[in-house]
């Protein structure tokens, strides 16, 4: 398995991975209506991460089986479909970097791929001068992030079109400690 920086040519395969991961791994945590609303309105590829070179994937000969990244930009979560404005850069001395858009193929869940992605994020964020991470965790993702030392700062409910509400958890941790 190869870990590499995602490129714009990976976007179609990443969209398919995100849809499959979200629909399958969220089934025990969210209702079908919540999953479909989140897939349509929240989950997706953030092409700014790809342009910045901070979105990674793990691939086999069959294509991407895991993806995730970090960001030095203000957006905390969501794909391109959530963005309406410019996405300004953060100040690494005063603001936390973002962990963004971790998705794993259901057949590869709990095989250490997300941890490999997280390690790449730590290296990149530390090199850029950041000392803290912040993220918005899905309910299925929260236990994974907690295992990395993230703590819940706030419980958030996101209201989506159609009156669907989806719970998330804003989490953070220092990144200058071992991961």
Predicted region positions:
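Conserved catalytic-core motifs of GNAT/GCN5-like acyltransferases
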Residues: 39, 75-78, 134-136, 146, ...
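Conserved G/P- and acidic residue-centered "switch" motifs that form tight phosphate/ATP-binding loops
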Residues: 10, 112-114
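Conserved acyl-donor/pantetheine-binding loop and adjacent beta-alpha core of acyl/acetyltransferases
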Residues: 52, 65-109, 119, 124, ...
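Conserved GNAT-fold acetyl-CoA-binding loop/helix
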Residues: 19-45
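Conserved GNAT acetyl-CoA-binding A-motif
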Residues: 118, 125-138
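A glycine-centered beta-loop-beta connector
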Residues: 59-65
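A short beta-loop-alpha structural element at the N-terminal edge
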Residues: 2-16
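Hydrophobic beta-strand residues of extracellular immunoglobulin-like
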Residues: 54-57
């Amino acid at each position: 398995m190869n870990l590499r920086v995602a490129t714009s040519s990976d976007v179609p395969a990443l969209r398919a991975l995100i849809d499959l991961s979200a629909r399958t791994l969220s089934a025990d945590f969210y209702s079908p209506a919540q999953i479909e609303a989140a897939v349509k309105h929240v989950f997706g590829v953030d092409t700014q991460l790809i342009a910045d070179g901070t979105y990674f994937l793990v691939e086999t000969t069959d294509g991407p089986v895991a993806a995730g990244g970090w960001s030095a930009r203000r957006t905390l979560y969501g794909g391109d479909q959530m963005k309406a404005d410019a996405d300004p850069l953060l100040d690494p001395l005063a603001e936390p970097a973002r962990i963004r858009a971790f998705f794993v193929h259901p057949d590869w869940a709990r095989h250490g791929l997300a941890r490999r992605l997280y390690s790449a994020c730590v290296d990149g964020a530390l090199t850029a001068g950041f000392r803290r991470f912040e993220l918005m965790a899905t309910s299925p993702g929260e236990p994974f992030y907690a295992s990395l030392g993230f703590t819940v700062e706030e419980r958030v409910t996101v209201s989506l079109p159609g009156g669907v509400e989806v719970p998330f958890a804003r989490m953070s941790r220092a990144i200058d400690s071992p991961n």
